[in-house]
Amino acid sequence: MEEAEGVAAAPGPASGLAFRGRRAMSGSWERDQQVEAAQRTLVEVLGPYEPLLSRVQAALVWERPARSALWCLGLNAAFWFFALTSLRFVFLLAFSLMIIVCIDQWKNKIWPEINVPRPDALDNESWGFVHPRLLSVPELCHHVAEVWVSGTIFIRNLLLFKKQNPGKFCLLSCGVLTFLAMLGRYIPGLLLSYLMLVIIMMWPLAVYHRLWDRAYVRLKPVLQRLDFSVRGYMMSKQRERQLRRRALHSERATDSHSDSEEELAAFCPQLDDSTVARELAITDSEHSDAEVSCTENGTFNLSRGQTPLTEGSEDLDGHSDPEESFARDLPDFPSINVDPAGLDDEDDTSIGMPSLMYRSPPGAGDTQVLPASRNEAALPELLLSSLPGGSNLTSNLASLVSQGMIQLALSEASQTDPSGPPPRRATRGFLRAPSSDLDTDAEGDDFELLDQSELNQLDPASSRSH
């Protein structure tokens, strides 16, 4: 049981917050109850004096300026009478109490006896003072009750603080009293009292006419221009810092830029403007097109229209004709006639057209060399005939060579008989026979010796030559 009570006595954070919330709610509820109780008491006390309170409020808010001015003069006269009179304070206090007693006797004893009683119908009804902008007795009592309760709570907390922290309370009270003593030393107490009276008289007027709101509306543009706020002050400080940083960076940049310019000027030679203008000037009386002169500064002076030739540059004036330039470099191309020695089916480089080298027998080799040489001699004219005028030789070189080879092969095929493929295969077998006989003797049985008539039947072209 004791452990459970200990756990309950030590609540967690959530329970502590809930406890504080309940305590605050209970404190506000107690305060409201106190305000209501004080309001009821004040209404009972000030209820009979509602007309007088309404007149005092009207005078304080200057609803009727004439009466308000009279009230203000009377209060000032009374204040300065009590302040400057040579009478003693005890006499003044006794005289004030005597006046208060007389007024009370007149109000409660003498006036009710001489006053005419009201009808019963009027006594049964409750009447109240109504003004659109002035406070009624209940409203005034409510505000006075709130001030009274707030003051009592402050005094209660101050006494509690005195009991719990006597040292701090002593320091706080000494500081406040010292401030009041210094203030009373430099400003007289009479003047402070008069200032308090003026503030009490002018406060209802300021609240009634909303002078604070009007003053704020008028002073707001001025405050925005002057920028007296803390935010504006901090922003101005930040702007000043940024401007200082920019100025420092600009100075550093100018210093570095000047240093770099001085270094570059030390390395670069200084040229005279007249010399440069004379070198750049181009006239007919200067050097010829083939001359290249060197000036004193080490620069080349080239005449008009002249460009020095480098090692890899081309002389365009020497070879202006594209056909001539192509014909000059044509012998450098490799021959298109392939040597048939040692070829078999795997390394055949033909493009499917019959060839004279494969088709001619051993005896007819001399007769077939002449057409091949003719075709080889006619290759440049064939390529030049197919060359388009003014075209780019580099881009069309591959297409021109391939077209020339195909046309040459077709021209050779037109001179032969269409029955060329079978003798080609036989000739290949005949050419491979000597090399295969060197390997083994058994492979010799695969070949058959033919007569001259059979050879003539297989190759009519060779029979014609014989």
Curated annotation (Swiss-Prot):
Q: Where is this motif: LIR motif?
A: 445-450
Q: Which GO terms describe its molecular function?
A: endoplasmic reticulum-autophagosome adaptor activity
One GO cellular component assignment for this chain's record is: endoplasmic reticulum membrane
Q: Where is the composition biased (Basic and acidic residues)?
A: 248-259, 316-331
Say yes or no: keyword Transmembrane present.
Answer: yes
Listed Polar residues bias regions: 294-310
Quote the entry's note on domains. Answer: The LIR motif interacts with ATG8 family proteins.
Q: What is this protein called?
A: Reticulophagy regulator 3
Q: Which organism is it from?
A: Mus musculus (Mouse)
Q: What is the lineage of its organism?
A: Eukaryota, Metazoa, Chordata, Craniata, Vertebrata
